[in-house]
Amino acid sequence: MKLSHLAAALSAQLVAPVAAGYLRQDILTAGTLRNTTVPAAPNEDLNQIVSDSQLLSLHRTICEIESVSNHESTVGEALIKYLGEHDFTTEKQIVPVDEDDDSTDERYNVWAYPKGSPKPKIILTSHIDTVPPHINYSLHAPEGDFDRANITIKGRGTVDAKASVAAMIIAALDHMKESPDVPVGLLFVVSEERGGTGMIHFSDSELNTSPPFFHTLIFGEPTELKLVDGHKGNLRFDVEAKGVSAHSGYPWLGHSAISEILPVLARIDGLGDIPVEDGGLPSSEKYGSTTLNIGTVRGGAAGNVVPESASASVAVRLADGTVEDAQDIIRKAVADASGGSKNITLKFPDDKAYPPIDLDTDVDGFELLTVNYGTDIPKLDIHDEDSDVKVKRYLYGPGTILVAHGVDEGLTVGDLEKAVEGYSKLIDAAVKRG
């Protein structure tokens, strides 16, 4: 082979997968982030830029610590130390490890408030756990001309939700410098990614008083620096089918559980597209259609055995109505599709189900956004029924959910810094409430 031909062949082999990688990333993130690594501009030290910033260095510190759900103790210790060094009184709220995990870590929620102010009227809260696997923190210079704001920070938790944690802390510290008695508290919870155990624990604790001592809750999640006016509800259920096993050559001697469950799943799969009057799940102008995801399907032992059991798990994102109404619609749909078969069982094991959550947006200067993902917000019961002052709930944060939980999770320095301004604006509005 001629040298020129060899060079061309090698070039094609190298370029093709790279091009495919760019295309995939562009589709996944809709142009939000590019999966590229460009050398930094001359004389620009990315690590030094981070080290010179209180915000960026705090964010790096907590993102470099692995804190997959049920293993949050180390990042909790780092936050306790940092907040204690910056005039916060800190408390650990021990949270038992989830039953299905064998971790021996003593993990806990971090509750912090300015010294002498144990009952702050404003609470900023986010979560310190992440989904697996841990991905190392890394810095990536922008394409083309160097712009500090366009440095990309990648790694697990850099967006969801340690960006919110870091920005909240700095926003609170900035207010404390100007007004040491600002009534702001910080609550960083564990296990948001595993059902909200941390927030449920706080909700059930003596800190969640009736009536509340706080009048404003500011939640942190990736919202693209927009103020969220609400998110869909959440409901989960399982479908199980029973059959009778037999040799596949003589199927009439048995009864297929998979044949039982298939028409039921087909009916379930379309409930979000069917009008309510025809037996479907509700939609709304604000949240759009209710969506269903058949996340797992299991059944059978082998291809030559009539299956004696089958099951499926389903997640529902509710766009309107109550959990109870949705469950009734699902029950009727399953009964209709199965012909009332006693071989089909429907189970609603999730006692954490909730309807759509409407949030406050009465602070000027923000774009508004409605999101489909769930949060810890419905896990915190607010006991303000008999209070003259109703608790306001805001949801805001840097980064986009489109990259959260993915291999390219990340955000820009500019977005992280703008989040401090956004949280400060929300704190200012809350302070004016008294």
UniProtKB/Swiss-Prot annotation:
Keywords: Glycoprotein, Hydrolase, Metal-binding, Protease, Secreted, Signal, Zinc. Its EC number is 3.4.17.-. Pfam families: M20_dimer, Peptidase_M20. Glycans are attached at N35, N136, N150, N343. The active site is at E192. Residues 1-20 form the signal peptide. One of its GO terms (cellular component) is extracellular region. Zn(2+) 2 binds at D160. GO terms for biological process: proteolysis. Zn(2+) 1 binds at D160, E193. The keyword Secreted applies. It is an enzyme of class 3 (hydrolase). GO terms for molecular function: metal ion binding; peptidase activity. Its cofactor is Zn(2+). Binds 2 Zn(2+) ions per subunit. It is found in: Secreted. Belongs to the peptidase M20A family. This is Probable carboxypeptidase BDBG_01803.
